Amino acid sequence: MNNKSLLYPVASTSRRVVSLDGMWRFRFDPKSEGVDADWANGLPESISMPVPASFCDFFTDKESREYCGDFWYETDFFVPGEWSGKDIAIRFGSATHHARVFVNGVEVAQHEGGFLPFDAVVTDIVRYNQYNKLSVLLNNELNEYMLPAGNTATLSNGKKVAAPYFDFYNYAGIHRPVKLMALPAERVLDYSVKHRLTADGAEVDYTVTTNGSHDVTVELYDGTTKVAEASGKEGTLVVKDAKLWNVHAAYLYNIVIRIHDGSAIVDEYTEKIGIRTFEIQNGHFLLNGKPVYLRGFGKHEDADIRGRGLDLATVKRDYELMKWIGANCFRTSHYPYAEELYQMADEEGFLIIDEVPAVGFMESTMNFLAANQGNGKKVGWFEKETTPQLLANHKDALTDMIDRDKNHASVIAWSILNEPQCTSEGTEAYFKTLFDLAHELDPQKRPRTYAIVMMSLPHNSKGQQFADFISLNRYYGWYVMGGMGIVDAEAAFRKEMDGWAKVLNGRPMIFTEYGADTMPTEHKLPSVMWSQEYQNEYLDMNHNVFDSYDFVQGELVWNFADFQTTEGIMRANGNKKGIFTRQRQPKDAAFHFRARWTSLPLDYKGNK
């Protein structure tokens, strides 16, 4: 049986979890010689490197920061003798982008994709009561079949350079926690829940997957009080007077799943879950049957020095800022985030649109970062010669994202792609496959969407009919008709909106991106583009448009904070559309948003 499991590592009476985070050994491998040279049995001439973190911004020389190719991590871990008889596994929260894992010189796993977890069972390879060697060979090169998409160029000096088709920096490394686990041979591999509200409480339907045949029980606890129980791998928990999970009023129960062999407990897995429903009816988003207007951000996992590496201090600051400003939602642009962010969203009562890392799916000549550097290669997406491998990778990432995140109360929708080229032949078949797969995989049948790029309009967006709600990325007043032209920008914006009104067929619309680059030190009277005054004028124009259309049911501004991108003439040390600086301090627009969002009722437009 396939023992793959994306359950978050939790210690229990039957499970042991040890963190392997810390200072590892590290070195580049520009000639790709490490495997043949047996570096998996000992990494020569290494330097120290923190895990989790991106390697890039620790270096002071550009060649190291921009390194593209193979690179290695190595550490040692101890396996206690009392773990004998259990399955020993090593789990990576993520590693960017292509990974090969070795234990004591033996290859134990390979993984493609830099934003989702994977593990390796190493029971037969580890040595007990002594230290073992863990080596990881990573590669951060980009290609047109991967998520996210790009290519890799070679300079005249022979050095490789990443040419992303996406507008964020190609950070690389072991970005999320690494865990050593001791697991029972027969164990819980997965579970799923879906919720129904009843007149006197709620019902939680569950399904449990194990790798054995022993009996299963499921219990639900409110603190230390058991409020529901059931037996069997499928069943229903009946919760009287259920306390529902809600926006900024999150309530979490503990679900406890056990495998029994007579009176003995073979395995126990526990996790926090919230009871809530989310659906679309009559053009509105309904949380627990009540309308909710989405307000918040597109974000990035991005911060000074650690790059894309998980940093709980930054995560905490971000949530405090989002609470302060009155936000209730964010999109995990443009990839699934670390699991710890979803856990905090569950705790704090934030809504998440969860996005697979399908970004850069346009002709690269249309991507100003790649084209600006001369690295653009004209590629039409969803063509016959590119689709099979791309689609296979896309399906794998979508499957793992839903498998990992399906039980989070905070996750309300799936975003299948960001700004794809959706006007070309092959779009409809490609999109239908993925939207159908998302519906099939998700027990809760959450709404599905994708972020529609500026040049995709109501009459030529061939995939929009598959979306349960429309998500637009629009930059009227910035990339088009900026400055004095903002008056014409508003007119053009409204003309497009009138076109969308004819094809929505009762679906709601949200804006998943809108924003203007703004230097935090730039004030100008009268305003000019890049000044804080212009950012506020731009936002006012957009909000006037949003407020004019009842079918607009959400606004997620781009971006929460300034973030790093590939260098180029269009980016001044990164994307500066943040409402906060990269150091998480407010620009003037933050106070602008706080005034707006804290005054809008949760059910804004809910009766229209």
Regions found by a protein language model. Give the residues of each.
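Secreted/periplasmic carbohydrate-active enzymes, especially glycoside hydrolases
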Residues: 1-344, 348-352, 397, 412-413, ...
